[in-house]
Regions:
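Transmembrane-helix signature of 12-pass secondary carriers
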Residues: 2-471
């Protein structure tokens, strides 16, 4: 009988170790249930998606206004009797503006906040787009395009800082990928609009003025997006920051990250580890965007040089390349989390260079080969295209984040100004093959630089990625 009771006790009573684990599990679950989450740990909500969507609008406008000028120039040049120098100046003027706008806009955004600049720039872009319709001389168009570039450039650090500071870490690459995809979407829409208006008398006026439409849509969508709580907290406005967190995330979410970043003077960007990061970003972004900007700004001319037709046919060729850029950015959003930032960047640069080398070494190839080579380059531009926005926002603290984005993007635009001005001249002097080889050389330079300097930031909070002892 005693043995039966003992056996029953052994069956019913769990082992001591199992009971301890069960108790420990209960305690852990209670701790997790009562512990507050940080902004990095929450799930994406419809309002957070709205912030990402409308913050990406500035990137859409950049792709739109930059690409549409390539189509518009095919009408503007004969209408105004422009030389290659004037054509190049019109194409490059927006990039000069972007250079000035990214640096000044980033600095002002860190001083007066994301929200105010978020609205001002859209109003200005719409105004100067309208003025472009009424220009009577080439210099007036250069001036209007310059100021459009200033405010498009200012939107880069504003919008991407806002996205980075609102988005949970697991969704940051996808949200920033939306910025890159929006650029390519804007360029693709521009090609479609340009194709539709190409046959109209004074169609170029409608093309340039059409940028007002997305400006109005974005203004409506942005009007209720709040100030960044991280920026507010960095300025000592903790009560306002807490109110924004309660409104957007809920009262159970903590304002400060688990590992808060220290105060970072602006001068810190110009020395030590942050200077190293700044140099990497400036050169990496330059190598990524210079060939792309040249292709978009003078797309119809480049397509014609490859024998893909002229007029509507060349615009269709540019549209096909734009579609490859857009499609390539979609899987890259997810590869940045699954593969990591660094491996995807290295793989992408290698395959981009391969496509450009084919174009440079075999410019007389069959049309199918030309399209596939352009497609290879454009498709794998998706990863670097996202990282040009993601890396600057991850690698610098809140106090100087927008400034860092502005300086990095602005530095890269020095190369795009020279390349965009020089592309029509180089096409005329050298031909399309050597121009593509120069582009391939730039991409290979980006590959080598990234091999030695590109960091891995996957799965880390902004406080961790912006610290100087993470790598």
């Amino acid at each position: 009988m005693a043995s039966d009771v003992k056996a029953m006790t052994q069956v019913v009573s769990p082992p001591a170790s199992a009971a301890a684990k069960e108790i420990g599990g209960d305690v852990a679950r209670k701790v997790r249930a009562t512990a507050k989450k940080t902004m990095d740990d929450v799930a994406m909500t419809p309002f957070l998606r709205k912030i990402t969507f409308f913050s990406s609008g500035g990137s859409f406008l950049d792709g739109y206004v930059l690409s549409l000028i390539g189509v518009a120039l095919t009408q503007i040049v004969p209408a105004f009797g422009l030389t290659d120098d004037w054509s190049a100046a019109i194409g490059a003027s927006v990039l000069v503006g972007i250079f000035a706008g990214t640096i000044a806009g980033g600095y002002l955004t860190d001083i007066i906040g994301r929200k105010k600049m978020f609205i001002i720039d859209l109003v200005a872009i719409g105004l100067f787009s309208l003025l472009s319709v009424f220009v009577a001389e080439a210099w007036q168009l250069v001036a209007a395009r310059f100021f459009i570039g200033v405010f498009v450039g200012a939107d880069y650090p504003i919008a991407t800082s806002l996205i980075a500071e609102f988005t949970p870490k697991e969704h940051r690459s996808i949200s920033m990928g939306m910025v890159s995809a929006a650029w390519y979407l804007g360029a693709t829409v521009a090609a479609v609009v340009g194709y539709g208006l190409y046959g109209m008398e004074d169609g170029w006026k409608w093309m340039l003025g059409s940028a007002v439409v997305p400006c109005v849509v974005l203004l409506i969508g942005r009007h209720d997006i709040p100030e960044s709580p991280l920026w507010l907290a960095s300025k000592g406005r903790v009560a306002e920051a807490r109110a924004v967190v309660d409104r957007v995330f809920g009262p159970d979410v903590e304002l400060a990250p688990a590992k808060p970043a220290g105060k970072t003077p602006l001068a810190t960007l110009m020395r030590g580890e942050y200077l190293k990061r700044m140099v990497f970003l400036g050169v990496f972004i330059l190598c990524q965007v210079v060939p792309m900007y040249a292709i978009y700004t003078f797309g119809p001319e480049i397509m014609a040089a490859f024998g893909l037709g002229e007029g509507h046919e060349a615009i269709l060729g540019e549209s096909a390349v734009s579609l490859f850029f857009l499609v390539g950015s979609i899987p890259a959003m997810f590869w940045l989390n699954s593969m990591g930032r660094r491996p995807l960047l290295l793989m992408s640069f290698a395959l981009m260079a391969a496509g450009l080398l084919v174009l440079g070494l075999w410019p007389t190839a069959p049309v199918t080969v030309i399209i596939l080579a352009f497609g290879l380059y454009a498709f794998f531009s998706g990863g670097p295209g996202i990282l040009q926005w993601l890396y600057p926002n991850e690698l610098f603290p809140t106090e100087v984040r927008a400034t860092a984005v502005g300086v990095a993007i602005g530095f890269s635009r020095i190369g795009t100004i020279a390349a965009t001005y020089g592309t029509p001249l180089a096409l005329d002097a050298w031909g399309v093959g050597p121009v593509m080889l120069v582009a391939a050389g730039l991409v290979l330079l980006g590959l080598v630089l990234s091999y030695f300097l590109a960091p891995e930031t996957r799965g880390k909070s902004l406080a961790e990625t912006s610290g100087i002892d993470d790598r």
